Each structure stands twice: as C-alpha cells, then as structure tokens.
C-alpha cells in the first residue's frame, strides 16, 4: 500500500461516511415506498376527476406517482403531529396563569450585589467560646475539696515499674 496524500485520503474517508449516511436515508425512503405499495398503491396510477365548467362535465385524468403520494402522506403526518402538539398545549392550559401585573414582577437589579465573604472568623470565635467556658457556679468549698482530693490521690499513688 502506497502512502499518498493524507488530505485526499481523509477526504475520501469522509466522503465514504457521508455516502453511507445518505444511503441509510435512501434505504429508509425505499422502505416507505415499499410499505405504501404493499398497502395497495401502485407506482403510477391514473387519477380521474369530474370538473363542471358551466354545465359541461369533463373528466380529467392525471398521473400520480408514489413520490407525490409519499410527500402528501408525510405532510399529512406532519400536520397530524402538529395538531397533537396543540392538543397537548391545550391540556396544559388548566386555568392558572403567571401574574403579569407590574407589582408582581421581579424588580430589575441595577447593580450587582457584593461578592460573598468568608465567615471563618465567626466560626473561629464560636469554637474558642466553647473551649473557654467559665464555670460560674463553683463555690470555694467545692473547689477546695476537689483540689484536696486530687492532692491526696497523687500522693498515695505508687508508680509501678
């Protein structure tokens, strides 16, 4: 295999991918035509219409191909889809509406609000307050008994080795 122009090779690959995509659309279109012909439509049929012009009746014959019929069917399907969407919109209209009076509108902000600030100092103060709690209910007798009890325990303890 020879190494050729890379740009041309890339374009060739892209063109092949594009052709594959179009082939899929073409296959889908052919499937639709086959489905319509399965329903009894021929590839080319004659259409007869009676036209009355001032009391003289004429019969016109026109050729209709499946392409026209397919386009008509697609347009009818599209119209039906649009009608279904309109019905859905009507179902959503349940009598409640967003108020539109000026007093119910959100005011226009002329200036941006200031940027949010860190609140670490408040959190730090809160922590220190919990750590430095003062005991205001201790009378001197309770404090003295507590201290003497601690002194007695420390003097009577023996260190084991």
UniProtKB/Swiss-Prot annotation:
Gene Ontology MF annotations: protein kinase inhibitor activity
Keyword Nucleotide-binding on entry: no
Region of interest (Disordered), ranges: 84-106
Extent of Acidic residues compositional bias: 84-93
Keyword tags: Cell cycle, Protein kinase inhibitor
Domain of life: Eukaryota
UniProt name for this protein: Cyclin-dependent protein kinase inhibitor SMR12
UniProt source species: Arabidopsis thaliana
């Amino acid at each position: 295999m020879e190494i050729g122009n890379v740009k041309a090779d890339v374009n060739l690959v892209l063109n092949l991918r594009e052709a594959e995509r179009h082939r899929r659309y073409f296959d889908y279109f052919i499937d639709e035509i086959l489905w319509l012909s399965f329903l009894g439509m021929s590839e080319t049929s004659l259409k007869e219409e009676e036209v009355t012009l001032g009391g003289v009746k004429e019969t016109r014959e026109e050729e209709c191909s499946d392409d026209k019929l397919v386009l008509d069917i697609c347009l009818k399907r599209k119209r039906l889809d649009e009608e279904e969407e309109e019905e859905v919109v009507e179902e959503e209209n349940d009598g409640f509406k967003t108020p539109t009076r000026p007093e119910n509108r959100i005011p226009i902000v002329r200036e941006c609000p200031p940027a949010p600030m860190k609140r670490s100092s408040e959190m730090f103060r809160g922590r220190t307050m919990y750590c430095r709690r003062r005991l205001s209910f201790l009378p001197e007798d309770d404090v003295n008994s507590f201290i003497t009890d601690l002194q007695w325990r420390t003097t009577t303890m023996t260190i084991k080795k």
